[in-house]
Amino acid sequence: YLNKEIVDEARTFGWDKVVYYEKPLLKKTRQLYAGQYGVALDSKEMPQHHLNQFGIKIDAFVKHHDSHAAAGYYTSGFKDAVILTVDAIGEWETVSISKGYNQKAIERMESIRYPNSLGILYSAFTQRCGLKPAEEEYILMGMAAYGTPKYKDNIYNDFVERKPFRLKRN
């Protein structure tokens, strides 16, 4: 989480509003659905709790994938763009496709929702290889360049329904 040095540096740039990168209550609905009751019901996991110690008030919340899309699009220099966001999970979305218009607006076109997540599948393979999920995926990615895809069809057949994209449940 945040520390004093990071907050002090951010304050040197100034700000008009503090916008948080996900909608915590929407995220908690997904955590409850997934059976993560301890985290979902813990008020210390609410973002404002972490910011109170720095005297910072959150002015607005945006969906996690919208914040990824905005960060990529508004810093890209493109007037119009198609924006692909893929990560383990936002509140519910795991993959989203959006359109950016005239550097003024972003519209969500399609999304894939939890529990269907390429990112979570990738983290599971990371853990299966003895690495730390949500931290060491880059090691697995680097090792992949030296392997051969001899188990690719088995992985697809065992874990993935292709149309529409879904992860098989066990």
Locate each region found by the language model.
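Short acidic/glycine-rich loops and adjacent helix/strand connectors
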Residues: 1-170
